[in-house]
UniProtKB/Swiss-Prot annotation:
One of its GO terms (biological process) is L-histidine biosynthetic process. Pathway: Amino-acid biosynthesis; L-histidine biosynthesis; L-histidine from 5-phospho-alpha-D-ribose 1-diphosphate: step 5/9. The gene is hisF. GO terms for molecular function: imidazoleglycerol-phosphate synthase activity; lyase activity. It comes from Sulfolobus acidocaldarius (strain ATCC 33909 / DSM 639 / JCM 8929 / NBRC 15157 / NCIMB 11770). It catalyses: 5-[(5-phospho-1-deoxy-D-ribulos-1-ylimino)methylamino]-1-(5-phospho-beta-D-ribosyl)imidazole-4-carboxamide + L-glutamine = D-erythro-1-(imidazol-4-yl)glycerol 3-phosphate + 5-amino-1-(5-phospho-beta-D-ribosyl)imidazole-4-carboxamide + L-glutamate + H(+). SUPFAM superfamilies: Ribulose-phoshate binding barrel (SSF51366). PANTHER family: IMIDAZOLE GLYCEROL PHOSPHATE SYNTHASE HISHF (PTHR21235:SF2), IMIDAZOLE GLYCEROL PHOSPHATE SYNTHASE SUBUNIT HISF/H IGP SYNTHASE SUBUNIT HISF/H (PTHR21235). This is Imidazole glycerol phosphate synthase subunit HisF. Heterodimer of HisH and HisF. Disulfide bonds: none annotated.
Length: 249
């Protein structure tokens, strides 16, 4: 049985970690390098670093911050934000990241997923899917959750698997920062539709939320509850272990 992963997320803007609600109203939460080191010490399995304004500002990912963050941790680091080309993927991996997360560019240029996967291996390619519920369906949003692509989330998940993604980072925009719990429904629907691991994101508020989501996802990503000290990673892992979830201690 594969261990379930607990992954803190560093949403980075102007070199600082920030957190908002529904992708808006961002508040400063600290230095990414310090937080990454702290989370590894506390028992995190991986770190996800997202340069959240690179795409909408039309610029490249902050390489110096990526390099500094990668240099202080030994657990896997996934980096996303502003990735538009194979050269971008190569530079991020070359600066110490283990995986890249491609979101908007995957929708706008599907070849980027397949070419990157062929070049660096599917294990290095994560496709991030930001979803919002509209009526009874879930749709894919890009450009930091601002643009509705009109693409059905389940169809897109199946497609990115075929394109060569090794993993999906699935974020519920509706739940992001609300601390009302993960969107188990869409996570389960997508998990059943593909054979690659799903990292669930958006809505973690209490320790119990992780127990629920890890029944349908391979990993749980969270930000605010870790940044604010609401949940400590080792306490969370002990709780999960006691409740029959396989975790790495």
């Amino acid at each position: 049985m594969t261990s379930k992963r607990i992954i803190p997320c560093l949403d980075v803007k102007d070199g600082r970690v920030v957190k908002g609600v529904n992708f808006l109203n961002l508040v400063d939460k600290g230095d990414p390098v310090e937080l990454a080191a702290r989370y590894e010490e506390e028992g995190a399995d991986e770190i996800v670093f997202l340069d959240i304004t690179a795409t909408i500002e039309g610029r490249k990912t902050m390489m110096n911050v990526v390099k500094d963050t990668a240099s202080v941790i030994s657990i896997p680091l996934t980096v996303g934000g502003g990735i538009r080309s194979l050269d971008d993927v190569s530079k991020i991996l070359g600066n110490g990241a283990d995986k890249v997360s491609i979101n908007t560019a995957a929708v706008e240029n599907k070849d980027l997923v397949s070419i990157s996967s062929a070049e660096f291996g599917s294990q290095a390619i994560v496709v991030a899917i930001d979803v919002k519920r509209i009526g009874n369906d879930y749709y894919v949003f890009t450009r930091s959750g601002k643009y509705n692509t009109g693409i059905n989330a389940i169809s897109w998940a199946k497609e990115v698997e075929k394109l060569g993604a090794g993993e999906i980072l699935l974020t519920s925009i509706d739940r992001d920062g609300t601390r009302e719990g993960y969107d188990i429904e869409i996570t389960e629907l997508i998990s059943k539709s593909v054979n690659i691991p799903i990292i669930a994101s958006g809505g973690a508020g209490k320790i119990d939320d992780f127990l629920g989501i890890l029944k349908v996802a391979d990993a749980a990503l969270a930000a605010g509850v870790f940044h604010d000290g609401v949940i400590r990673i080792m306490d969370l892992k002990k709780y999960l272990g006691k409740n029959g979830v396989e975790v790495r201690m």
